[in-house]
């Protein structure tokens, strides 16, 4: 299965009538493996900050997490595994696997829980596949 298929069928899928605003699978260096049409372009320093937060949980909490210059308030996640952010009525979930970052960005009416479920389910699957 191609990386694009994972994005199209597993991240951009419909959940209770809603779907993510955008999604992507990136390498740990920020290289885009696959993305939805509206996925924002990460800046290298944003990826560096995200990876540092996975290595040092809480690193982004004081400053917030920036994605394509949009600032997200970092909220409860799973140290070393999941970073969650909130911005207005929407937010972001990033799941780290052995080789990839699975990213989902949502807006209302999708809920944070729905975004978490979609992103983390694919991330957990990729981890089980050794990816």
Swiss-Prot record:
What are the annotated disulfide bridges? 13-115
Name any one GO molecular function. Answer: actin monomer binding
Q: Which Pfam families match?
A: Profilin
Q: Which residues carry this modification: Phosphothreonine?
A: 111
PTM comment text: Phosphorylated by MAP kinases.
Principal location class:
cytoplasm
Q: Under the cellular component aspect of Gene Ontology, which terms does the record hold?
A: cell cortex; cytoskeleton
Keywords assigned by UniProt, alphabetized:
Actin-binding, Allergen, Cytoplasm, Cytoskeleton, Disulfide bond, Phosphoprotein
Find motif (Involved in PIP2 interaction) and give its ranges. Answer: 81-97
Tell where it localizes: Cytoplasm, Cytoskeleton
> Which family is this sequence assigned to?
Belongs to the profilin family.
Q: Anything else the record notes?
A: The variability of the residues taking part of IgE-binding epitopes might be responsible of the difference in cross-reactivity among olive pollen cultivars, and between distantly related pollen species, leading to a variable range of allergy reactions among atopic patients.
Q: How does it assemble?
A: Occurs in many kinds of cells as a complex with monomeric actin in a 1:1 ratio.
The job of this chain, per UniProt, is described as:
Binds to actin and affects the structure of the cytoskeleton. At high concentrations, profilin prevents the polymerization of actin, whereas it enhances it at low concentrations.
Protein name (database record): Profilin-6
């Amino acid at each position: 299965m191609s990386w694009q298929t994972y994005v199209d069928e597993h991240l951009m899928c419909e959940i209770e009538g809603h779907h993510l605003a955008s999604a992507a699978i990136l390498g740990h260096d920020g290289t885009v493996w696959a993305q939805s049409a509206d996925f924002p372009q990460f800046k290298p320093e944003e990826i560096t900050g995200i990876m540092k937060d996975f290595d040092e949980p809480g690193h982004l909490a004081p400053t917030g997490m920036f994605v394509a210059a949009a600032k997200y308030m970092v909220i409860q996640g799973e140290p070393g595994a999941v970073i969650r952010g909130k911005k207005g009525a929407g937010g972001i979930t990033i799941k780290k696997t052995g080789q990839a970052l699975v990213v989902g960005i949502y807006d209302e009416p999708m809920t944070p829980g729905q975004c978490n479920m979609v992103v983390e389910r694919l991330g957990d699957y990729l981890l089980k596949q050794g990816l």
